[in-house]
Amino acid sequence: MVSACASPVAAYSLPAWAAAAAGLFLFPAATLLSSQARVRAERIIYAASWVLVLLAAHQRLDGVPRPPSALLNANAFAGTILLLLPMAARRKDWVLTAGLLVCLWWTRSVGAWLGLSAAVLLHRRSVGPAAFWAGAAVGFAGLVAAYAKLHSPEVLHRVEWWMAAGRMAVSAPWLGLGPGSFAYALPAHVAARPELNSLYAHSHFLETAAEKGWPYLLVWGAGLASMLRRAQPSRRFGPVAALVHGLVDYPLSIPGIFWLFCLSTALCLPESDEGAAVRGTRKIPAAAFVLVLAWLAGAWTRDNWRADRLRAKAAESFLAASEALRPHPEAARLRAQLLLSRAGEGDDVVAAGHLERAVAMDPYRASNWVLLEQVYSRLGRPADAAAARARGARSCPMLQKLAPVRVLKGGPA
């Protein structure tokens, strides 16, 4: 909290702190869960695992080479799979386990496979010799694949991001630059190249040091080591794999995956003797305290949403006034992007109209045609999407070489 308030970009750090705090809250909360409550929590995760696998299979059959399932992208899905695999194995659901491994193969995440291999090698006694040698083979193949990519942009860019995170951590060693600040501080620590823009450092520990300071990183690392060292092998397998994956990728920077990681790690802790019971004389004050906290959190979140909508409306008003004076393709595109951020079907229809005007005024910008095709696909109008692609290809022949757009979730792909 202190790091967020003292951040040079506190407006961005405070929401990121709230997301991180929600994950940290799961550690004490999990110890208060009874055995039955823990079983129910695992059942929910188990059901969600099946949903993710089936959705990924549907996407794969639909022609998506690296299906992200319901996650941000394939890399995020890979990080989630590492946390779900041990739960499937504990329940002896080998069909789900196989499905998760197939999905992990589809993601093509070398870092995730290295994380899985490292977890297998570290748990030699519990996984058995066959799994141990299979993990060793997978790890060797992963290292070969990583070596083959050594001079590829994705590796070279990671090195730049890691070095930038290190410089940030040195510049603010005690409190860091604030949770969620990496993307906003990055331009000051790397060369001005568009391909180096990134929301995350692609390294959990370096990003933690840069955003929250070295003392926090030491406490966080020591706490995780203490909890995982005493945990049952089947419980710590997933968090260990996710942490190794987090050395070279960003899934633990995504709130939902971080919460799953925190819950998986927290369930390694023994059940508290006190349980979640509250003495009779304290029930009303405790309930009132929880309700007040919930109301404050809800009010804070509501105000953030209102502020975001007001900013969007203000920008829309300025752009509309600008176009009323002189129509411009860039203004039309920006108005469409603002509407698409609201994710309402009516907004999508209006956004399509703005994009039609943008391509009419500037038919040579390929990204406008692609965005228009995405909007029509999201609206369930494949004929219009295909027509937009054909019209765009007449002005931008490069569009003929691109694969057709497939919209998978609630926003443009």
Descriptions of predicted regions:
Residues 1-4, 17-29, 36-148, 210-248, ...:
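Alpha-helical transmembrane segments of multi-pass inner-membrane proteins
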Residues 144-159, 285-316:
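Hydrophobic alpha-helical transmembrane segments in integral membrane proteins
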Residues 160-198, 205-208, 212-218:
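TM-adjacent membrane-interface loops and short helices in multi-pass inner/ER membrane proteins
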Residues 311, 315-318, 343-356, 380-389:
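Structural signature of tandem alpha-helical TPR/SEL1-like repeats
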Residues 321-324, 357-358, 391-392:
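Canonical positions in the second alpha-helix
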Residues 325-329, 363, 397:
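Short coil turns that delineate tetratricopeptide repeat
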Residues 331-334, 368, 401-402:
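TPR alpha-solenoid repeat register
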Residues 339-342, 376:
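Residue at a conserved register position within TPR or TPR-like alpha-solenoid repeats
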